[in-house]
C-alpha cells in the first residue's frame, strides 16, 4: 500500500487494484506543487469525496472528466453532480459499503458540515462523512473533516483500522491534541497520518502535539507529495 499526501485533506492511496484520490484539491491549493500534478493523478481509478466544501471538491468534477474516474461519495451530492455535470458517480450513504475493484469502501459518520458554494451562498451538499477503506488485508480510516466523536469506538469495533488519516489542524476540525485523544481513546492504530494542517496560517503548523500525545504509535508526517509505503 502506498499513501501520498497531496497537501491539506488530499491524498492518493494505491491499494490492491485501485488508485484512489481522496478529496483531491489541486487548483488553488497553496501547498500543492504544480509540477507534480501528473504524478499525483497518474492511473487514478476513483475519486472519493468526504463532503462538499470547496477545499475538498474544487477539482472533483473536472478531474473526473479528465481522468474518466467516477466520483464516490454521499448520495445527495453524487446525484446532483451526475445530473448537472454528467459525470459518472457512485452514491451511497453512511453504513453502506461499495466495492471498487478489490477494495471495499464503507462510509462512516463525521461531525462537520457540508455545502457547495454558489452565487447565492452555501447550498446543501448532503452530509459530511469519513471512509473505511479495506484492501490488501488492511483497513485505512480516512476521517474527513470532523471533531472527536464517540462513534469512533463503534468504527474501531466494526472495522479495526490499522491506519488512521486524521484531519487535525484545528479551527475547522479537531486539533492535534483532540486527534491524539481520539486515536488513543477509540482506536488501535499502528500508524497515524495527520492532515488538514500547514495549508494556511489559521491552521496548525506542526504535528508535534499529535506525536507527543501518541507515544508508541507510528505517527508519520510526510511532506507534500511524499509517498509512504506500508
From Swiss-Prot:
Keyword check for GTP-binding: no
InterPro entries: Metallo-B-lactamas (IPR001279), RibonucZ/Hydroxyglut_hydro (IPR036866), UPF0173 (IPR022877), UPF0173_UPF0282_UlaG_hydrolase (IPR050114)
Hydrolase keyword on record: yes
Domain of life: Bacteria
Pfam families from the UniProt entry: Lactamase_B_2
GO molecular function: hydrolase activity
Keywords: Hydrolase
Matching NCBIfam families: PRK00685.1 (NF001911)
Matches recorded under HAMAP family: UPF0173
PANTHER family from the UniProt entry: UPF0173 METAL-DEPENDENT HYDROLASE MJ1163 (PTHR43546:SF3), UPF0173 METAL-DEPENDENT HYDROLASE MJ1163-RELATED (PTHR43546)
Family: Belongs to the UPF0173 family.
Protein name: UPF0173 metal-dependent hydrolase Dshi_2788
Amino acid at each position: 500500500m502506498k499513501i501520498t499526501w497531496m497537501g491539506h485533506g488530499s491524498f492518493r492511496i494505491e491499494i490492491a487494484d485501485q488508485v484512489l484520490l481522496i478529496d483531491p484539491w489541486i487548483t488553488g491549493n497553496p501547498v500543492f506543487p504544480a509540477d507534480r500534478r501528473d504524478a499525483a493523478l497518474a492511473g487514478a481509478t476513483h475519486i472519493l469525496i468526504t463532503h462538499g466544501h470547496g477545499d475538498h471538491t474544487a477539482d472533483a468534477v473536472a478531474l473526473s472528466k479528465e481522468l474518466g474516474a467516477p466520483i464516490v461519495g454521499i448520495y445527495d451530492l453524487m446525484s446532483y453532480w451526475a445530473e448537472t455535470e454528467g459525470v459518472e458517480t457512485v452514491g451511497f450513504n453512511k453504513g453502506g459499503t461499495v466495492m471498487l475493484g478489490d477494495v471495499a469502501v464503507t462510509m462512516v459518520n463525521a461531525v462537520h458540515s457540508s455545502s457547495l458554494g454558489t452565487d447565492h451562498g452555501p447550498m446543501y451538499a448532503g452530509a459530511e462523512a469519513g471512509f473505511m477503506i479495506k484492501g490488501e488485508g488492511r483497513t485505512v480510516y480516512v476521517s474527513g473533516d470532523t471533531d472527536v466523536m464517540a462513534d469512533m469506538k463503534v468504527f474501531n469495533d466494526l472495522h479495526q483500522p490499522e491506519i488512521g488519516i486524521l484531519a487535525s489542524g484545528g479551527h475547522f476540525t479537531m486539533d492535534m491534541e483532540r486527534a491524539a485523544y481520539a486515536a488513543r481513546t477509540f482506536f488501535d492504530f499502528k500508524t497515524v497520518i495527520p492532515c488538514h494542517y500547514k495549508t494556511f496560517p489559521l491552521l496548525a503548523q506542526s504535528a508535534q502535539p499529535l506525536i507527543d500525545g501518541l507515544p508508541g504509535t507510528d505517527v508519520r508526517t510526510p511532506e507534500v507529495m511524499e509517498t509512504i509505503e506500508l
